[in-house]
Amino acid sequence: DYVANYVKANLPQYAALPVLSVSAPFKSGFGGGTDYTDVAQGNVAINNAADLYLYPNTVYAVKVSGADIKNWLETAAKRFNQINPALTTPQNLISSFPGYNFDMFTSKDISYEIDVTQPDISKGGSRIKNLNYKGTAISPTQEFIIATNNYRASGGGSFPGIDGSKTI
């Protein structure tokens, strides 16, 4: 709501655009089996909250197209290895791609599927299927405002099209 309210109050030229948010887990097992945040039952302490968000990032907003969102998600989907459904032996689903680059759009207004049977974007594949906003397919030219952090907005993680030039 912070970014949506800021846009409405300070950037009226973008007020009609949908505002979505994206985030990534910082501790998601990338560093091994202990690379998770364990919050014990009961009161949450300051160190629990600090353990969830490790970096001094700030909130930024970027104006992107539907094509940018798809490429953003395709890059995040590199978190998963390609799975061969014909194999009956176990296959590792999680790749060595850092969890802090596994950006997820979590708004109820956006939905998508990640097809891990397809190669990832770095191999010319397309894993993101059924990318919708409010139940309707997102057009490559449709515009959105995305709340993210300054690291990602400035090009951190090498996400296609997110290079600092789209910050509003």
Which functions belong to the PLM regions below?
Residues Y2-I168:
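Feature captures C-terminal
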